[in-house]
Regions:
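Hydrophobic beta-strand anchors of alpha/beta hydrolase catalytic cores
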Residues: 59-60, 92, 137
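A short beta-strand-turn-helix
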Residues: 37-58
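N-terminal targeting signals for export/organelle localization
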Residues: 1-40, 148, 156-163, 168-169
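Soluble periplasmic/extracytoplasmic beta-strand elements of cell-envelope proteins
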Residues: 61, 94-96, 148
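Structural microenvironment flanking redox-active thiols in thiol-disulfide oxidoreductases
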Residues: 71-111, 121-127
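Short pre-active-site segment immediately N-terminal to redox-active cysteine/selenocysteine motifs
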Residues: 56-58, 62-66, 133
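Thiol/disulfide oxidoreductase modules built on the thioredoxin-like
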Residues: 54, 106-113, 121-166
Length: 169
């Protein structure tokens, strides 16, 4: 047993290091803000996510045209934007990662995406987040703080969106 204890300690420490990183949580002392990075619009202009959200709660979906899982979420995001987000001080925003705006615009048109789209052509936004994985979902409160980060659109992200909307101004 004496030889096993150091091995077990190393094994437990290694297993703990392999977990996914903790999602950023907004706190009164040090909220994690959305990166102030310039993103392309589908028309080729530039803006920042905070400017597009304009003081509204935002559900942000990071995606790519080649991502099959991302495509499965898009119909749900269209419905969410048309029902839950509309009229409640919230907005759904898609951010394509690593592609050029013309390609993304054509894809969005073919897919019938009605929610706002931005493009992170040079990975500056996702690199500032420390997260290149797609699909990924963020919920951003009215003050630009990231209050939820997850791998995909699911019950946890929808609950975070509901809480952020309910929190009011």
């Amino acid at each position: 047993m004496g030889h096993r204890l150091p091995f077990l300690v190393v094994l437990v420490l290694a297993a703990g290091a392999c977990g996914t990183p903790e999602a950023p949580r907004a706190s009164s002392s040090s909220p994690v803000q959305v990166p102030a990075v310039s993103l392309s619009t589908l028309a080729g202009d530039h803006t920042e996510l905070a400017r597009l959200a304009d003081g509204r709660v935002a559900l942000v979906s990071l995606w790519a045209t080649w991502c099959e899982s991302c495509g499965k979420e898009m119909d749900a995001l269209n419905r969410l934007d048309a029902t839950t987000a509309a009229g409640r001080g919230a907005v759904v925003i898609g951010i394509d990662v690593g592609e050029e705006p013309g390609k993304v615009a054509e894809f969005a048109r073919r897919r019938g995406l009605r929610y706002a789209q931005l493009v992170d052509e040079d990975f500056a936004f996702v690199d500032a987040l420390g997260q290149r994985r797609v699909p990924s979902t963020l919920v951003v409160d009215r003050h630009g703080s990231i209050v939820f980060r997850g791998d995909a659109l699911d019950g946890r992200s929808l609950e975070a969106l509901r809480r952020a909307i309910a929190a009011g101004p």
